[in-house]
Amino acid sequence: MRINHNIAAMVAQGSGRIQNQNLQSSLEKLSTGLRINRASDDAAGLSVSEQLRSQVRGLNQAQSNASDGIALLQIAEGAANEMSAILQRMRELAIQSSNDTLTSTERTYTNTEFQALMQEISRISQATQYNGMTLLDGESSSFGVSSGPSVLHIGANNNNNVAGGTIDTMTVGVDSLTLGAIGLTLTTATDNGTNITGQANAFNAIDSIDSAINSVNNMRSDMGAYVNRLEHAINNIANQKFNTQDAEARIRDVDFATETTTFTKSQILSQSARSEERRVGKECRSR
């Protein structure tokens, strides 16, 4: 017979304490929706989950970077499109001026519009900007942060070398579309430049404009290819993000069916332990 210790009551108390802890843990998981709320719940699982969360955040930013790249290219392509329309009008004027039916006075009128259109091309090349960066002026070889064609970071991780190449980045370049770059020259006090004041000049202007149109078309083609690639990159990033989030959820999120069963079990055992503790205490008092 034990006098100072009631072993049965101590066992009931210990069991009740354990079940209460399990009950609180299950309640926390059910209320937060997470299986891992702290490192003690699953140290290894928490580490993997945090790495996956970091990956998801990186993919979110990569998707934003790619979208920014598309926005930039669309601005540049829009400006190039307007330049193309201007060049087509300039070509019409040059062909008109090459006709012998025009007088020198009429050629002067057509040349006035011709020069104004060239000035507009020059203005567009200087004024086309994205986030404060001038895209088409030819003063910088890039529109980003590198000293060459810009590098868009479209991956979740740091840039890594793979067989002499790179991953997670995309190199994008926008060439200069200034008048000089496309082979045209404004008329000044000391330089006749590209003009259509005479029939011979008009013929020369047609050749120069054809070359300029080809330059603009090539640039627009490149920009279209870049945009298509970035759109595919965004789709791929979205797919990666979905699968990574799913993997992280499988590790960190609670299984409500399983945890509800555990909660109910702990609740029953906790109540049973309290009942047993009361029964043992009553027996001890009745002796």
Name every feature range the model reports, one short phrase each.
Residues 285-287:
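Hydrophobic topology marker
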Residues 1-282:
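Primary detection of the long, small/polar-rich alpha-helical "axial" segments characteristic
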